[in-house]
Amino acid sequence: YVHIDSFETETAAQFEEAVKDLEDQGMKALIIDVRYNPGGMVTAVVQILDDILPEGTVVYTEDKNGNRQDYTSGGDTYLDYPLAVLINGESASASEILAGAVKDYQYGTLIGTTTFGKGIVQTIFPLENGDAVKLTTAKYFTPKGNYIHGVGIEPDIELEYEYLDKEAVSYDEAYD
């Protein structure tokens, strides 16, 4: 079980360390919990997906001019374990990138409730006076081209929150 509360600069390294520790303990399956995770850095979630998924596009963005940027997994280190991802209505942005890629590749099972639906990239531009402005600069799409903004990602198995207390979930319970 690995809980990710946001996707920051150090998140991928922390994820890799946690998975290695679990492997050393004889891990047979992996549960990634991104409930209540508002997102974070695209590069951080892409690094984690590089550890999880086989080679291919994990997400792509398009700006207002239709310019597309693909983010890919090299597929060299992908995990060979059954995978469940816990999601809810507070899972947004980078959390949805993770959930969308896992779902599109059919690499794991999404469990919980429909995600928030933030399918946009926002960039912070600092101003000379010390203030900053945050602008939407692109839309993002799942590997299969799904635009989830305002819609979210539906789980494969819908379970309400009270059944998904992170302290009580085990792999067997997640698949029962």
Feature map (PLM): residue ranges:
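Residues in well-ordered beta-strands of folded domains
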Residues: 3, 59-60, 136, 158-160
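Short, acidic, Ser/Thr-enriched surface-loop or helix-capping motifs
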Residues: 142
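Cleft-lining beta-strand/loop regions that shape enzyme active-site pockets
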Residues: 1-125
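Short acidic, Pro/Gly- and aromatic-enriched capping/linker segments at domain boundaries
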Residues: 127-138
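Conserved functional hotspot residues or short segments at active or partner-binding sites
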Residues: 148-150, 154-176
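Short hydrophobic-aromatic micro-motifs
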Residues: 2, 133-135, 148-149
